[in-house]
From Swiss-Prot:
Biological source species: Saccharomyces cerevisiae (strain ATCC 204508 / S288c) (Baker's yeast)
Any further remark recorded for this protein: Present with 8660 molecules/cell in log phase SD medium.
A Gene Ontology BP annotation from the UniProt entry: intra-Golgi vesicle-mediated transport
Keyword set includes Secreted: no
Name under which the protein is recorded: TRAPP-associated protein TCA17
UniProt keyword terms in alphabetical order: Golgi apparatus
Signal sequence range: none
Family stated for the protein in its record: Belongs to the TRAPP small subunits family. Sedlin subfamily.
Length: 152
């Protein structure tokens, strides 16, 4: 079974979106793209909520299922050291609730986090040039989510 995200959002420590990536954006309806932007915005409330515990005893970031809305299950991870927020949505009908599924979702988050770190720390990119960082992130996400499917 393949697991493919509907969207991937990277949000900085000041709650400014770095990138809201939608695989095959040209093929998606504009309403879907707008829906994913709204879901990313809604997720910010969960990061600020006192009801959601974002840290654990170990230093590993916690992955949380934060809400389901409009047929999309939204998961999030907060990297405390940098304030980076990663939000990824999956179609609810593609999720089975199997035990290994959460581990596969966690692996997708780790891959996204590593891609972000590699792009951000790339010495060939000018650190203040956000457009080149975004283009590089989009290209890497296209390679990950469009050219191959993530297998469970």
């Amino acid at each position: 079974m393949s697991l493919r995200p509907c969207f991937v959002s990277l949000i900085d420590e000041s709650d400014k979106p770095i990138l809201i990536y939608v695989p095959n954006e040209a093929e998606n309806e504009m309403n879907d793209v707008l829906k994913y932007n709204v879901l990313s915005n809604i997720s910010l409330d969960y990061f600020e909520s006192a009801l959601v515990e974002w840290h654990s005893l170990d230093s590993k970031p916690l992955l949380k299922s934060i809400f389901q809305l409009e047929g999309v299950s939204v998961f999030a991870m907060l990297i405390k050291q940098t304030g980076l927020k990663i939000v990824i949505g999956f179609e609810q009908k593609s999720l089975s609730g199997a035990d290994d599924e959460f581990e596969a979702i966690n692996q997708i988050f780790e891959t996204v986090r590593k891609i972000y770190i590699r792009v951000k720390c790339n010495p060939l990119l000018v650190s203040g040039d956000e457009k080149s960082i975004i283009k590089s992130l989009e290209r890497k996400f296209d390679e990950l989510f469009i050219s191959t499917e993530v297998e469970l």
